[in-house]
Amino acid sequence: MSNLSRDLVEEIHSRVPITSQRAVRSTCKRWNVLSKDQNYTKHLGPASKEIMLIMIRGCRAHLMSVNLHGVHNHKYLVDTSIKELGKLNQVEIFEVLHCDGLLLCVTKDYSRLVVWNPYSGQNRWIQPKSNTFHTLDRFAIGYDINNNQKVKVLRFYYWSDYVEYEIFDFKSNSWTVLDVTTHWKIHRRSVSLKGNTYFIAHERFKVDQQGEFLRCFDFTKERFGPRLPLPFHSCLDDSVILSSLREEKLAVLFKKCDACDMEIWITTKIDANTVSWRNFLKVDMQLYPERFRSPCRSFLVDEKKKVAVIFDIDRKTWTNYKPYMVGEDGYQGEVDLRDSELWMLMCSYVPSSVKIQ
């Protein structure tokens, strides 16, 4: 087997479930070495026509593969094939954050965190300073690009005028308070990209006048970057949701509370200090009178098919979410994910060989 070409080895690995990769890597020394190549792991997982997702069902985190082969076939119900690639069974999960193949999972009871790499099977538990984390705690995950991709976790806490930021160091197994003073507040879900984490933020005392903006936390420098512009003016009542495209681009969904249009923008350039945008999709919401009346929870973009899958509130239960697809020229569809009302999309997923220290 050690004499097989790299192309053939990649083809073999691409057909193996993510959580079974460890057994395949142990087949021979060359395969194990190859599996640690970051350029190689980018091509792992399902074929390019499929999308890997992290979803929660019954407080369990699942790694799923979805094939949107029914897109643009002029049917309202979009037929999909979905299969489970992995599952984190040890604990009930409230939230999942993704960074370069690593998942930061917040437990339902806020008693601890777990960082999990479905590709390598590694996991690492993180304990709070006191008995438990606070329900107002927010988290982010990233890594130091100058230190062998050293993984770090950011915790931040807002209460009235009090703000606290901490970094968890895996080597010392301890939390360190950051000397950071901010005059703005983060209140929406974050997204990690290329080791850094991006947040939607607003000024703490001039919300409506200033509007919202983008902030990046640089895990290498352990500090926030400058204020970055969004391609629109938004306030707290509007829907503004971040997503990522294969750890390469940032996407943002925007729907003004009193407007009939919904927009999705994608970055053409982004780092801790600069950002530029292009409009990916603009949807006339009058075509969907029964949908998207309340803020959606999450979304993902298929750039090649020029569609977006949006998890919107289910009008039957008003507690669960269902996935709907929108695209150019009024294209729409309901995505059949098998009991989709029981699932919650957290983020897209890209496998990686990044190690948890």
Indicate where each model-derived feature is located.
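N-terminal entry/capping and adjacent linker segments that precede and initiate structured domains
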Residues: M1-Q357
